[in-house]
């Protein structure tokens, strides 16, 4: 059986796409009594508070019926924002030559958390420039990654 995040993504995606938004990603954070389901949506024209409210209403109704989560949780719907988290390698493709913050499952070259310039994305393989060195990382080895906005 798929893990909870994959199951939630499969349940939520059709509702988000029916409202003509892209499902950027889903996070379920367990924190004792205060678990949170975070749904990130995107659209080429941006995301408004009303868009988030519409998606929240649809997703909430759907999850009430499907009931995939067996603990109390808060539902949050938002855009990925300027520090957008990356849930898969394909999402990184438009951000080549940008700075991305990474947290790896296990250290590579004595680094587990670092910022790097994204040089290339080929399938699940990422090529990164870190401290005047090049690092190859497979997306399955990435625990978390998010864009680091440049303020020029």
From Swiss-Prot:
<dbReference type="Pfam" id="PF02576">
    <property type="entry name" value="RimP_N"/>
</dbReference>
<dbReference type="InterPro" id="IPR028989">
    <property type="entry name" value="RimP_N"/>
</dbReference>
<dbReference type="GO" id="GO:0006412">
    <property type="term" value="P:translation"/>
</dbReference>
<keyword id="KW-0963">Cytoplasm</keyword>
<comment type="function">
    <text>Required for maturation of 30S ribosomal subunits.</text>
</comment>
<dbReference type="InterPro" id="IPR003728">
    <property type="entry name" value="Ribosome_maturation_RimP"/>
</dbReference>
<dbReference type="GO" id="GO:0000028">
    <property type="term" value="P:ribosomal small subunit assembly"/>
</dbReference>
<dbReference type="InterPro" id="IPR028998">
    <property type="entry name" value="RimP_C"/>
</dbReference>
<comment type="similarity">
    <text>Belongs to the RimP family.</text>
</comment>
<protein>
    <recommendedName>
        <fullName>Ribosome maturation factor RimP</fullName>
    </recommendedName>
</protein>
<dbReference type="Pfam" id="PF17384">
    <property type="entry name" value="DUF150_C"/>
</dbReference>
<keyword id="KW-0690">Ribosome biogenesis</keyword>
<dbReference type="InterPro" id="IPR035956">
    <property type="entry name" value="RimP_N_sf"/>
</dbReference>
<dbReference type="InterPro" id="IPR036847">
    <property type="entry name" value="RimP_C_sf"/>
</dbReference>
<dbReference type="GO" id="GO:0005829">
    <property type="term" value="C:cytosol"/>
</dbReference>
């Amino acid at each position: 059986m798929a893990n909870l995040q994959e199951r939630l993504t499969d349940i939520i995606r059709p509702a988000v796409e029916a409202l003509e938004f892209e499902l950027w990603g889903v996070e379920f954070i367990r924190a004792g009594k205060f678990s949170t389901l975070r749904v990130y949506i995107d659209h080429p024209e941006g995301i408004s508070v009303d868009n988030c409210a519409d998606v929240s209403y649809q997703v909430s109704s759907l999850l009430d019926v499907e009931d995939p989560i067996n603990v109390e949780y808060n539902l949050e719907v938002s855009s990925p924002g300027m520090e957008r988290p990356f849930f898969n390698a394909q999402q990184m493709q438009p951000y080549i030559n940008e700075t991305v913050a990474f947290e790896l499952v296990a250290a590579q070259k004595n680094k587990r958390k670092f910022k790097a310039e994204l040089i290339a994305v080929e399938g699940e393989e990422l090529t990164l420039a870190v401290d005047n060195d090049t690092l190859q990382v497979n997306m399955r080895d990435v625990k978390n990654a998010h864009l680091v906005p440049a303020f020029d």
